[in-house]
Amino acid sequence: RVGYLIAKPEIASKLRENVVANTNVLAIQAAITAMNDNEFYNFSLKKVNEGKALMYKAFDELNLEYIRSNTNFIFFKTGRPIQTFNQQMKAEGVLVGRPFPPYEDWCRVSMGTIEEVQLFNKALKKIFS
């Protein structure tokens, strides 16, 4: 996993103090190559946005509160302990995010393929209907 930060120098300097691991040369080169692949970037962005639109629609239909996201994941309120929700989704063949204290009834779900998002929505509707 490779990440990067765009920040003011003083903030980047402060954050750099907490870096716990170095990234190897192969990972860095792979990240640079990926960042320069505009066609794949645009394809991925399109698919993530399509997935989020499908999830937003399901959340709206079920009246579930959620936070609109500029990332590849969505944070939404389940209204039940996350451990309970995780078990319910797992029983439907879907694995979802870990707890994010103190938001014990919220779930973070990452985008997958459109087919995976559809499976997620089907399980979600079964659990909340």
Regions found by a protein language model. Name each.
Residues 1, 70-72, 103-105:
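A generic structural signal for well-ordered coil/turn residues at beta-strand boundaries
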Residues 1-59, 64-67:
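PLP-dependent aminotransferase class I/II
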Residues 3-6, 85, 115-116:
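Short, hinge-like loop/turn segments at secondary-structure boundaries
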Residues 12, 41-42, 82, 86, ...:
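Internal amphipathic alpha-helical segments of the cytochrome P450 catalytic fold
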Residues 49, 53, 58-92, 111:
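Conserved PLP-binding catalytic core of the aspartate aminotransferase-like
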Residues 87-96, 100-129:
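PLP-dependent enzyme catalytic core of the Aspartate aminotransferase-like
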